[in-house]
Amino acid sequence: MDKRLVSVPYMATVDEAVKQMIQNNVWSLVVERKGAPWGVVTERDVLRRCLVKGLPTSKTSVGTIASSPIVTIGSEATIREAMGKMAANEIRRLFVVEKGKMIGRVTQTELFQSTLDVMEALSSLSSTL
């Protein structure tokens, strides 16, 4: 889980959001509206919902291309539950919530790596038996 949660205001421009992504080395931002988490904007949203459509990034509000609501999962969820939720929602990242507060995000890549790590550990264990 990556605990770096970077946010951007709903009315920020796509240009501003992309700068935030680059400066923070993240590819998704939490979009805030009225001071609360409202949605998520990703690099894919920028490409598909803005650039491909020819919308001006300097004038387009990040809120108009963001996905909402934010898809979350509890901090005690299993890898299987997280992967299932991603598949069901056709998304590549989930935001992790604990006691009603967002504490991080997890990506498909991180879940796949965790699965591989577990499989490798099991393989190593079974070969020593």
PLM region descriptions:
Residues 16-20, 33-35, 53-55, 65:
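Short hydrophobic/aromatic-rich motifs at helix boundaries and adjacent loops
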Residues 16, 39, 49:
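Short acidic/glycine-rich loop or secondary-structure boundary segments that cap or lie
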Residues 1-4, 42-72, 78-87, 105-129:
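Tandem CBS (Bateman) regulatory domains
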Residues 21-24, 29-45, 86, 94-110:
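A glycine-centered beta-loop-beta connector
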Residues 7-25, 32, 72-90, 97, ...:
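The conserved cystathionine-beta-synthase
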